[in-house]
Swiss-Prot record:
Belongs to the sirtuin family. Class III subfamily. This is NAD-dependent protein deacylase 2. One of its GO terms (cellular component) is cytoplasm. Zn(2+) binds at residues 136, 139, 158, 161. Its EC number is 2.3.1.286. It is an enzyme of class 2 (transferase). NAD(+) binds at residues 25-44, 108-111, 199-201, 225-227, 243. NCBIfam families: PRK00481.1-3 (NF001753). It catalyses: N(6)-acetyl-L-lysyl-[protein] + NAD(+) + H2O = 2''-O-acetyl-ADP-D-ribose + nicotinamide + L-lysyl-[protein]. Its cofactor is Zn(2+). It holds the Pfam family SIR2.
Amino acid sequence: MDSHSPIATVAQALRRAERILVITGAGLSADSGMPTYRGLGGLYNGRTEEGLPIEAALSGPMLRRDPALCWKYLAELGKACLAARPNAGHEAIAELQKHKPECWVLTQNIDGFHRQAGSPAERLIEIHGELAPLYCQSCGAESGGLEEHLHGQLPPRCAACGGVLRPPVVLFEEMLPEEAIDTLYRELRKGFDAVLVVGTTASFPYIVEPVLRTRQAGGFTAEVNPGVTDLSERVDVKMTGRALDIMPQVVSHIYR
């Protein structure tokens, strides 16, 4: 490989770095067969069968007002996640974390693929939550995994009190989880030597801020994306392509 190629440049920077933040979005899981979408989980674009914007169907207010409708689309989202698996991009990121004990992952994805690929939970910030375990909105009781509830009557109900179950995921019009935000900003205050943005359109402040902060502090920044994003001209190196193809090359170049 050309020692001046984007992949070689990123590999060299990551080899030197100790504190690393990898930010991932729907584009990473698209390579596992998950459709991309700029918001929740990457499943939909446009309107539902009922003529609603998907943001309205998969929202906190809709879950309260019409839980059956909200769960119709939560169930499709869940089935898509359960039918897919982590890909080589997830595995390469987990491998990087294994070698770099201060490498963190901040993900917008709710599919759990980083955990499945081996990323340590204590260095994984799931900013939009995850799809399991379900819990009761009324009494708070946990009710197991997602799969057992997807093929019965919707919305799924709590065995203890009959309340509507939900996953610990951030729906539209809901607040981001306080613990995840606190963890992110605690680590940001410590600073990062390098930030790598993988498969996200970077339209949220908590995606953009770590990149800008790190670059202003003299750190290294890079992006992996097949298209142009808001960050493409604001990072040190842009790697054009799929995370599935690029991330294994980056990590193997570090540890070859």
